[in-house]
Amino acid sequence: ECKDADGLILSVDTLLYGGLIPSRIHHETKETLLSRMELIREIRKENPNMLIYAFQVIMRCPNYSSNDEEPDYYERYGKEIHDAGVVIHKSRLGIKSQVQLSKLMDKIDQKCLNDYIGRRETNRFMNVETLQYLRDGWIDALVIPQDDSAAYGYAAMDQSSIREKVREYDMVDKVLVYPGADEVELTLVSRMINVMHGKCPKVYVKYAVEKARDIVPLYEGLPLAETLKYHILSAGCQQTESYEQADFILAVTAPGEQMQEAAGQLINHKKWYEQRNLPEMIEFLKERIKEHKIVSIADNAYANGGDIMFIHLLDKNQLLMQVGGYAGWNTSANTIGTAIAEAVDMLYNGKSKQHDNFLVERYLEDGGYCSVVRGHVTEQLPSGMNYFDVKETQGIVSDQVKQELQTFAQKTLPSIADRLIITKAAMPWKRMFEVDLEVKYCHEKMV
């Protein structure tokens, strides 16, 4: 399939392990993994002129106990394994910790911990191998996003180790290591499109509150402003301080203090969210749209869902379908990368049916499902079902999800609700975290 291609976006984790989740639970040997890497050489030899942009995630270390996407023993020891990593990392940096490492170790089965540390070592070894492939010219660009990252712990230590190798190989300007994961395919497609057009679009970042620059979003380990710089660069764009000169504007809704989970925004609204100047943000966006500027919204006010108040303001001001992009899902980094990619698509392709459909899917999934419907449906699950197991991809649960999303649209998106058709709602992993949603936007109102 690559013989006649101009470019390849390659997930090294998929090539080596079969995917992101399999990369956390595999028992592959280094020899097997190294043999799989050889495919990259074969592809390069067959099509020497094809651009190859690769990405490979640093294995995460969640701060909770669950085996939903981790090894089985993580359900019992996950929190303790994470906390032990934090204490070990701080100790190496000369930072005192209030928790004694010995007490944590007493709670963890040593065989399980050895397995976990061994898998991390194998994955880190393969991260370095991929760096060598870049150094030797087998791939053209490499991004190493850190999945569900934090400032301290096993994942942060791995990141430091990999950064040392990047410096040793003199590739600081070639390898980007930053918070993210699920959005990186979109980011690299954006970069490839920009490179093939010979352009480096200018991006102006508009904050809802200036203090947001310095916050460290949930599940990440860098200040927001630095993560934004990485994502803009990784997408083949450049940041500008002048919105007049910008090719598109990235509107960022993050708070000026600690980020909260989206599911609690309607019942436990934190006062510091009031520091955001949303009226000024809306007026700014309206004026830029009048000037025919592309505006894309990175709705990272909360983690794991969109800001219902902000979506309401977009609806109230007839802006929902005038913006060039919207995202508000999972981590702040996932949201940022998606919003940038939407803007790049709009820059080259303009408005399209596919773009509009994706936009309304974001409003219903990121705002509707993630922030409101997911929690409500979870509370009403039939006997025998729970958040992690709803027994089916389509059925009682997906039907209720679809019905509640339609209600959400009528209540929160009234300016476009009668133009939306939900053609699919399914639970692809038979759990509540994700929904497989397909929505069509009709330019004419439905009778």
Regions found by a protein language model. Give the residues of each.
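An N-terminal assembly and electron-transfer interface module characteristic of large anaerobic redox
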Residues: 1-447
